[in-house]
């Protein structure tokens, strides 16, 4: 369980651009559309990726087999903790694949939210929810929530929906405090490693600023060009420093050679 679930706005598992399961905070209506746009523009050639813009942190964990683990959180959430969320989702997928069965077949040609029921307990564990029905109230657009709303007409109105959506991300339950400590201890060992991974992989990319699907690719390309420019500039500065050192050494040698000639009055010392 994360220390403050209210800081987590969205998290999901996707294969390619198909969202297999997701958690959507009721405090962020419509954020899943932004998340899908980000997933469609997943940065290539990265295993871990994080960027903060407009007080939101967008974090990716990308596997070679096209699985993408993605989250949107408040900028105040610590980076190691946001990476822990994605690593927890990754371990859940690895367990499903290891167990085999129909779940593996489902992943061959996945459909939207095909693993929602399987992964609801994992989302509940992450945000510290005991009752999965409460968790499902935040899974906006999931098959279970749509079916439940169709059975309950009182939720169709905005007023009824607000009444039905009980506060999910409040203070942790007392019964979960021990569980929270255990999870904090378990993820503590990964903090240093995740933090170092984040530092070397973080790029300055605006993932969803104006809704343009080409924003991420454009900004990533600009970032790479900027990195190349900085490398070239650093190389030029290094060459300049080398030449300065060589010229300084040459001047010292010339002065010492002149002093030697003056003391010996030419090359008489050698002739003697």
Swiss-Prot record:
Residue span, Longin domain: 12-116
GO biological process entries: protein transport
Compartments, record wording: Membrane
Coarse class of the protein's main subcellular location: membrane
An example Gene Ontology CC term for this record: membrane
Entry-linked InterPro entries: Longin-like_dom_sf, Longin_dom, PHYL
Membrane topology type: Single-pass type IV membrane protein
Transmembrane spans: 243-263
Domain of life the protein comes from: Eukaryota
UniProtKB keywords: Coiled coil, Membrane, Protein transport, Transmembrane, Transmembrane helix, Transport
Function description: Non-SNARE longin protein involved in membrane-trafficking machinery.
Matches recorded under PANTHER family: PHYTOLONGIN PHYL1.2, PHYTOLONGIN PHYL2.2
Family statement: Belongs to the synaptobrevin family.
Protein name in UniProt: Phytolongin Phyl2.2
Upper lineage: Eukaryota, Viridiplantae, Streptophyta, Embryophyta, Tracheophyta
Protein's gene: PHYL2.2
